A protein has these predicted regions:
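Sterically constrained small-residue positions within well-ordered secondary structures
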Residues: 6-7, 79, 100, 115
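Residues at beta-strand starts and edge strands
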Residues: 10-12, 82-84, 105-107
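A short coil-to-beta-strand element that immediately follows conserved catalytic motifs
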Residues: 76-86
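Catalytic core of non-heme Fe(II) oxygenases with the double-stranded beta-helix
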Residues: 88-130
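Non-heme Fe(II)/2-oxoglutarate
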Residues: 1-76, 96
Length: 130
């Protein structure tokens, strides 16, 4: 038998810079309502379908292309995936975002609109789901 390397349960991560202006989207995000999540100071938009709004048309197209690129190049699939939900999170000073999983997702994504360089970057944890 020949030696073989099997990569079981890999976690691919694709990073794609968004080069367009986000001024219009940022202004819109300032006008919508948010609700505190789990008492840790993190706020989530009441609207969980932001990509349905005209203000997010360009971002919707960008994210759709990114998902298709990931599906084709990483998952090696011709199946087109659809983004089902999209919401905004706000984390004021002193707040944190809770660790969580997306068990019903094939692909999950994050897009940062404003980043405070003094804060730690996004963190990922490996969980064993039984």
């Amino acid at each position: 038998m020949k030696e073989e390397l099997l990569q079981l349960f890999p976690t691919p991560l694709l990073i794609i810079p968004y080069e367009q202006s986000i001024d219009k989207e940022l202004e819109y995000l300032k006008t919508i309502s948010y609700r505190e999540q789990q008492g840790n100071g993190n706020y989530r938009s009441d609207d969980s379908y932001l990509l349905r709004n005209e203000e997010f048309k360009d971002i919707k197209n960008f994210l759709g292309e990114a998902v298709n690129k990931f599906t084709t190049n990483v998952l090696n699939s011709k199946q087109r995936l659809v983004i089902t939900q999209c919401w905004a999170n706000r984390n004021p000073k002193g707040s944190k975002h809770h660790e969580h999983i997306h068990p019903n997702s094939i692909v999950s994504g994050v897009m940062y609109f404003q980043i405070n360089e003094k804060l730690p970057p996004i963190q990922f944890a490996k969980t064993n789901q039984a």
